[in-house]
Amino acid sequence: MKSSSSQSYDVFPNFRGEDVRHSLVSHLRKELDRKFINTFNDNRIERSRKITPELLLAIENSRISLVVFSKNYASSTWCLDELVKIQECYEKLDQMVIPIFYKVDPSHVRKQTGEFGMVFGETCKGRTENEKRKWMRALAEVAHLAGEDLRNWRSEAEMLENIAKDVSNKLFPPSNNFSDFVGIEAHIEALISMLRFDSKKARMIGICGPSETGKTTIGRALYSRLKSDFHHRAFVAYKRKIRSDYDQKLYWEEQFLSEILCQKDIKIEECGAVEQRLKHTKVLIVLDDVDDIELLKTLVGRIRWFGSESKIVVITQKRELLKAHNIAHVYEVGFPSEELAHQMFCRYAFGKNSPPHGFNELADEAAKIAGNRPKALKYVGSSFRRLDKEQWVKMLSEFRSNGNKLKISYDELDGKGQDYVACLTNGSNSQVKAEWIHLALGVSILLNIRSDGTTILKHLSYNRSMAQQAKIWWYENLERVCKKYNICGIDSSTDGGGSTYGQCSNSQFQRNMDASPGGNKTSNQSTKDSPRASQVEKEKIEYCEPHVYITPAIFSDGTRAPKYVESSSRRVTQVHHAKTWWPENCEKVYENHNNIYGIDRSIDGGDKFEGKSKVSDGGLDGKDQGSMYGQSSNSELQINMDADNRRCEPVSEMLFKNYNVCSPNGLTDVNCSNPQSQRKLDASLKKDKIVHEWIRTGSGFFFDFQGPKSIVSAAQVDEKNFEYCEQGVYITLGILSGGIIVLKHLEFSRRMAQQAKVWWSENWIKVYQEHNICGIDKSFDGRFDDRRVIRQLRPN
């Protein structure tokens, strides 16, 4: 017959069938099955006088052997031969063996005395001395191992439950992935005490604390520690996906019941199934990152929904949510102390709680860079792992830079927090004080208060749907925030690109956002006091050190002019009574003010303009105009954004609309967020004679563009056009013939870069077809080392 032992087993049971098959062993199998332990079953094996190779293989392929010694165990040569094999695997293969003494004295088994010895003596009659020696040795050694004696338990059921738990812990020990989280044992012990395992009553508790204190890590470690005690268990991190409240609740219940009952695709017709199905069931439930009271009401509405001894843990940042759900027992998680933070850093950096000799000062400085936030400690500590002293010094120098500090801060954010990034850097001569304002709907805004008292507020959103929620909040609350914090500018861009980039969603309150060092202007001031756009001095439009952010604004009289949202503390540009941003009619601005030469639409405001610092009527001063920095991502608004309109031929409006061309004067304006790389890119494009001729004449296939046939093949795209950009900024460039298309994408963390990769893997063909993009970089930090990725993504 075909062997059933071709697979591995968790447990091999060795027992005398006549004594315990339909009693103890049957109940033991049930307990093991409840814990998803794969147990060998010999029911289909034909018994014979000699043990079969099939059984020998099953013993070898099992991780644990359970030997049940009963009154008539020794009457079976089959059992004794299996025991010899088990003892051999214990010695040679380090297999785990657990003896169970069922209504028999362990000393009688070890010494083959008493009633057990009498039965064994009968079995040995007619056997060779070699067989008897093997059996006696196996009985003595296995019976000496730590096991369970029924006489020590109040009931058989309690003993079997404990055996199943012990086996589960040996097979699936709690994860040690949390060992680097110094102090986690204290958290777990406190939570176990709060859950009251000494009580038969079901209990629900909460874990609460600020973001990035390790609440989820603590919750997962607790779940890992307790899960072996619960057949029905679930670690839940659901979020709202469906607009309809009722449909969303049905979806949550179906997912929850499928997971906790281990049944695929459970379907329910109406809400309330959780209470109906689990009210007599002992469960372990951990709800992570809860921010929706409806989730609690749907899945754990009442403690009476669950059976006795059930344990439910709710993890959230919102204490008011726990209060609203009447969760009285709350465990507060704070940031680790300086001592614990230092130990945590050392665990990640050195694999132990303290630094080795010669690294004390270096470790102290590195730990201070990370602060007391667990994720930052993990990121920084892991960065120094296995580095020598010289490499430590070099790495510390890198971490002192603003870029790495920003990256650490960003990596500290949780999944939702990383959808909203708020960052700003002022001039090095300014004393900056930063504080987080936690706004409605989970939006985080960073206020930078300069030494002169004025405030810059920057809001960056990468999720368009969440940005819409942010807009609603700003519409209702912006005036109050601006007045309270003396805000002089705001950027409400959504995702670093698209037609809405740079538009303010709070036009009603924009007039209150033009704070000057002298104070804020009010919205009630007459428009007659407002300067006309023509009165704006040209010298206001100039390079003002790094971190300058220019944006166009519409005055109260309808005229328009550029406006600095941010400038250095030494040059504060004053433009009063801007009411809204320019969502339409931008051509009028450039017709009236041809000194406007571009807009910085970068994410962090850290790009500086190339070329000379001032703008004249004839364009940029000097011969080397450099790159047209800050090109618009909205093709329709970019048509007239050239410094020298008189020398630029009219551009086909169709091409701008359909292909999002970055500037009207052609291919030299491919824009990169790194000035040094931009110059290289411009220079390489200018060397192309065909491109140069096209720029000079303003004619050719550019204006006669009919379709993909006019585009150079992907193979002709010079890979040197894919430039490296600093500080971990994620850039994707798709360059057509000479550079017509520029696709720019900014990412600040590997997690978000991975998300971008997933999106591109699913949609890049469609994007290529629509925009004729010839190449794209999928790397995390803009280092285009993997040319295979670029080649792979080129269209056929």
From Swiss-Prot:
Residues 502-528 have a biased composition (Polar residues). GO terms for biological process: defense response to fungus; regulation of defense response by callose deposition; signal transduction. It comes from the Eukaryota. Its EC number is 3.2.2.6. One of its GO terms (cellular component) is cytosol. Residues 434-486, 538-594, 719-772 form the BRX domain. It catalyses: NAD(+) + H2O = ADP-D-ribose + nicotinamide + H(+). Residues 7-171 form the TIR domain. Residues 185-413 form the NB-ARC domain. Residues 502-537, 607-636 are annotated as: Disordered. Gene3D superfamilies: Helical domain of apoptotic protease-activating factors (1.10.8.430), P-loop containing nucleotide triphosphate hydrolases (3.40.50.300), Toll/interleukin-1 receptor homology (TIR) domain (3.40.50.10140). It holds the Pfam family NB-ARC. The active site is at 82. Keywords: ATP-binding, Hydrolase, NAD, Nucleotide-binding, Plant defense, Repeat. The keyword ATP-binding applies. GO terms for molecular function: ADP binding; ATP binding; mRNA binding; NAD+ nucleosidase activity, cyclic ADP-ribose generating. Residues 607-624 have a biased composition (Basic and acidic residues). The TIR domain mediates NAD(+) hydrolase (NADase) activity. Self-association of TIR domains is required for NADase activity. TIR-NB-LRR receptor-like protein that confers resistance to the pathogens Leptosphaeria maculans (blackleg disease), Botrytis cinerea, Alternaria brassicicola and Alternaria brassicae. Required for efficient callose deposition downstream of RLM1 during infection with L.maculans. This is Disease resistance protein RLM3. The lineage of its organism: Eukaryota, Viridiplantae, Streptophyta, Embryophyta, Tracheophyta.
